[in-house]
Amino acid sequence: MRTRITKTLLDSWNYMFDCAEGQEDNAREEFLTTLKREQTPPNEAQQAGLDFEHLVMEIAEGRFVPEWVDQGGRCEPNSGEPMGYDKYPKNYAGAKKIAEIVQGGQWQVHVDTNLTVDGRDFWLHGFCDVVKAGVIYDVKFKTKSFGSLDLWGSYRHSSQHSAYLRCLPEADMFMYLVSDGEDLYIESYNRKNSRPIEEIIHDFMEWLKTEPELLAIYEERWAVDG
């Protein structure tokens, strides 16, 4: 039996043990929603992240056009040109910093691989935000300013870099590009400082075995056809 597995599932599982105090019930509910593969609309923070990523993409691909704000139909006295100014959206400064790094890269690259852990076959797959010159980039957006956050090592427990580096052998680096709309924080991982994804999957499956009902859901909902 072969089952699919993703960084989203693994990270939602891990979050149950790494969430803020008092959020344990919410974290478990989020994991169960992911495990059951139930579709839910993005929450406010997720939508903000999607909007920010779209802005980065538009800038990187040269498609972004600022809004022109006309100043009441007035014209320049010498040239006769309409008077006004370009209005840039909130978070543009941070998006531009990321766009300058990922410009020329491939967006939303599907990556996958088959692997075997403890005798069980898995199909590991996902989508990289950007791949460029042997580096996988993931765009992250923080709704809080960096001044109020402790950023160092924010993603060390994420399975994302471990999973995607395993899926894309020609890549040698994974970089999280994180912005609060103004500043840029970069967190980098390679294979030497990333936990093998096989170890993470092993721990996940060992935990599932302690919850037989959830293991049954996983084997049913995440089975690979054929």
Where are the language model's segments positioned?
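Coil-to-beta-strand transition motifs
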Residues: 121-125, 132-134, 169-172, 182-184
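Hydrophobic/aromatic-lined pockets within catalytic cores
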Residues: 60-64, 141, 166-169
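Metal-dependent nuclease catalytic regions and adjoining charged, substrate-binding loops involved
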Residues: 9, 166-226
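Conserved catalytic cores of phosphodiester-cleaving nucleases, focusing on short active-site segments
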Residues: 126-148, 164
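Short alpha-helix boundary/capping segments
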Residues: 44, 152-159
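Metal-dependent nuclease catalytic cores that hydrolyze phosphodiester bonds in DNA/RNA
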Residues: 1-128
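Short, structured patches in soluble enzyme cores that scaffold and shape functional sites
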Residues: 111, 140-141, 178
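An active-site-proximal "capping" alpha-helix that borders the catalytic cofactor pocket
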Residues: 157-168
